[in-house]
């Protein structure tokens, strides 16, 4: 048992030590990420970015002066958006079915957080309600 715990601790330390966050300039971001920022967040001022070269997960984290954060994968595709201080996630980033559902059930609310991968979309509204949709935009889960 002690060997198992020691092995587990060594593995955990190795994984944490392998995280390699390094600062990057705006011009070092993937072209796709820069185009995304310029199209969907043109009024936001860039604060800093870092490249996370963790095992199995390479991504860019971009932070704006208002605190809004966007995570991009290594190809420059957005994965997570967390808006701050009155900023909102543009509805045009989502499938029509998600926009229609949210517009019908929460017409006065905006999306302030979004997370996506190949299988699902997650959104958080200004009123705190969170939804998970499948990749086709069908609702799968809701948390208020």
List each model region and its residues.
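Sec-dependent signal peptide recognition
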Residues: 2-8
């Amino acid at each position: 048992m002690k060997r198992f715990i020691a092995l587990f601790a060594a593995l955990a330390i190795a994984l944490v030590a392998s995280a390699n966050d390094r600062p990057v300039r705006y011009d070092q971001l993937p072209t796709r990420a820069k185009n995304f920022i310029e199209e969907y967040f043109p009024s936001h001022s860039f604060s800093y970015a870092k490249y996370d070269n963790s095992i199995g997960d390479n991504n860019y984290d971009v932070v704006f002066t208002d605190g809004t954060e966007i995570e991009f994968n290594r190809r420059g595709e957005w994965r997570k958006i967390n808006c701050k201080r009155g900023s909102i996630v543009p509805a045009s980033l989502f499938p029509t079915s998600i926009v229609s559902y949210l517009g019908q059930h929460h017409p006065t609310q905006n999306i302030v957080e979004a997370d996506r991968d190949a299988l699902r979309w997650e959104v958080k509204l200004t009123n705190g309600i969170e939804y998970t949709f499948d990749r086709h935009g069908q609702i799968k889960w809701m948390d208020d």
